Design a protein with these regions (language model features):
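Catalytic nucleophile-loop/oxyanion-hole region of alpha/beta-hydrolase
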Residues: 114-122, 134-171, 314-321
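Short beta-strand element of the alpha/beta-hydrolase
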Residues: 99-107
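Primarily recognizes the serine-hydrolase "nucleophile elbow" in alpha/beta-hydrolase
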Residues: 155-226
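C-terminal catalytic histidine-bearing segment of alpha/beta-hydrolase fold enzymes
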Residues: 1-8, 272, 279-334
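Mobile cap/lid helix-loop segments that gate and shape the active-site cleft of serine hydrolases
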Residues: 74, 218-261, 267
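Acidic catalytic loop of the alpha/beta-hydrolase fold
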Residues: 112, 216, 276-280
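Short beta-strand/loop motif that positions the catalytic acidic residue
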Residues: 265, 270-273, 277
Length: 334
């Protein structure tokens, strides 16, 4: 097909306004602020995050006129609980039926979601590798929203499993992963307190965590070490309110400190991050890797020295190729 032009000078808002991307376009960036709406694609790393192939795949799917956006909850549930209206997932069908599938969870500090760079770009690349992928959009922008986001994650898995024949995927066989806050959420599926066992869903065959944030005790330490008005205090406070609620205490934060709730049954893990990450410190990913080593959990890492946060596919960085490596690891351990 003949694709619409995509240039580095185009703004995120131009993509959202375009009709050629259908429902995919409305989920490029949730709860967007003017700074992102007006930002040129070049400012995110035009080639680094794979804008062109991703937008082409979105245009291909939208051009079919089929539905690829699915609400997580029934109409009755959406009517009775106001915040269950927005949670949904996007379906990126792969070229081969009956294969395992992947669920991708974009990040955004539980305040919004960078759906294109940390969701659709990964799904489009997985399609190229022969896999069907689903991009999860969960509840954000509330105090104590992580527990609700975990509920959304399991609602997504249950719906895909129940409709496996319709989606032409292999039930019970999947990889799940996420980026930043999305990785925080994905990681909980293996935890002893919020994990797949308590939710009654199939165990994921592998989890990938990209620049994850799991050391909640460290975020709490930053919150208490600096006074109100200091950027470290205020940034940690905003994040921890969304994680644990308005009463930020060690007791409220502790259940979400992932490595305190991992055991040997945790699924195999693939980790990627950069040492110079200024948003989710590299120590988060390193701690997960060290915990996996200690507990004998199969794991693989692709760490870079530079590249910071939010790199998505990471094309042109030291970590380039991490997704292909993660998929190979998934195929090896499943």
């Amino acid at each position: 097909m003949k694709y619409h032009d995509i240039t580095p000078e185009m703004a995120i808002g131009d993509l959202v306004k375009s009709k050629v991307y259908g429902d995919f376009g409305t989920h490029i960036f949730t709860d967007m602020t003017p700074d992102h709406w007006n930002a040129p694609l070049a400012s995110y790393g035009f080639e680094k995050v794979g804008f062109v192939p991703t937008l082409h795949r979105m245009e291909e799917l939208a051009s079919t006129g089929k539905n690829y956006l699915y609400p997580l909850y029934s109409e009755e549930e959406r009517m009775s609980e106001w915040d269950k209206e927005s949670p949904a997932f996007l379906h990126f069908p792969g070229p081969v039926a009956g294969r395992p599938y992947a669920i991708i969870i974009p990040g955004g500090a539980f305040n919004r979601q960078w759906g294109l760079v940390e969701g659709m770009a990964i799904a489009a690349a997985l399609n190229e590798m022969g896999y069907t992928a689903f991009v999860l959009f969960y509840r954000t922008k509330q105090d104590a929203v992580v527990a609700k986001a975990i509920e959304d994650m399991y609602a997504c898995i249950r719906q895909i499993e129940a409709r496996a024949d319709e989606f032409e995927v292999q039930a019970g066989h999947y990889m799940i992963g996420g980026f930043s806050a999305g990785a925080t959420l994905a990681g909980e599926i293996g935890s002893t307190n919020f994990g797949w066992k308590s939710a009654g869903v199939p165990k994921p065959e592998m989890i990938f965590l990209a620049y994850t944030a799991v050391r909640m005790k460290d975020f709490y330490a930053g919150y208490t070490a600096f006074p109100a008005g200091h950027p470290v205090h205020d940034g940690a406070a905003a994040f921890l309110r969304r994680v644990a609620g308005p009463e930020i205490t060690p007791e409220a934060v502790e259940p979400f400190d992932l490595t305190s709730h991992m055991d040997a049954s945790y699924p195999p893990v693939y980790l990627t991050a950069n040492e110079d990450d200024h948003t989710a410190p590299f120590s988060n990913s390193l701690t997960v890797a060290e915990t996996c080593e200690k507990l004998g959990i199969p794991h693989k890492t692709r760490f870079g020295k530079t590249g910071d946060h939010g790199f998505g596919l990471g094309i042109g960085l030291e970590v380039e190729g991490w997704l292909s490596e993660a998929v190979s690891f998934w195929e090896e351990v499943r």
